[in-house]
């Protein structure tokens, strides 16, 4: 049951830290699974399983390049995450505005001393 949720939901897929690290590595460009596995300190089959999950939710694309398969980031798959976190933008903007006002008040108080 958990397997189905992981492969159909981008939030579940990126909940796994090693999958997020794979996405970070792929921001620099497409790479073969062996290179990703070595970078992450995991087995090639383990990296392949993570890549399969990421591919199934639309975060990774693969293409054949000679004898190897290259995996690349498809950031369009992060749209649901972006849209969901965007709902908190107002909260963060207001928080940063209050922090900025506080810092300005501190600066002004120091100048008056």
Segments from the language model and where they lie:
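Short, Lys/Arg-rich nucleic-acid/phosphate-binding segment
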Residues: 64-70
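Short, hydrophobic-biased segments on the C-terminal half of alpha helices
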Residues: 51-52
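Pre-recognition alpha-helix immediately N-terminal to the DNA-recognition helix
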Residues: 20-22
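Interfacial catalytic loop of ABC nucleotide-binding domains
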Residues: 9
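C-terminal regulatory/oligomerization modules of transcriptional regulators
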Residues: 1-6, 25-39, 44, 56-61, ...
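Short helix-coil-helix linker/hinge
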Residues: 13-18
């Amino acid at each position: 049951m958990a397997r189905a949720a992981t492969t159909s939901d981008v939030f579940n897929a990126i909940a796994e830290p090693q999958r997020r690290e794979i996405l970070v590595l792929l921001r620099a460009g497409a790479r073969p699974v062996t290179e990703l596995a070595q970078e992450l300190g995991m087995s090639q089959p383990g990296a392949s399983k993570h890549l399969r999950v990421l591919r199934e939710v639309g975060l990774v694309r693969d293409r054949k390049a000679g004898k190897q398969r290259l995996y690349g980031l498809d950031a369009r798959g992060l749209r649901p995450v972006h849209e969901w976190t965007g709902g908190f933008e107002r909260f963060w903007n207001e928080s940063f505005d209050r922090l900025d006002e506080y810092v300005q008040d501190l600066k002004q108080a120091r100048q008056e001393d």
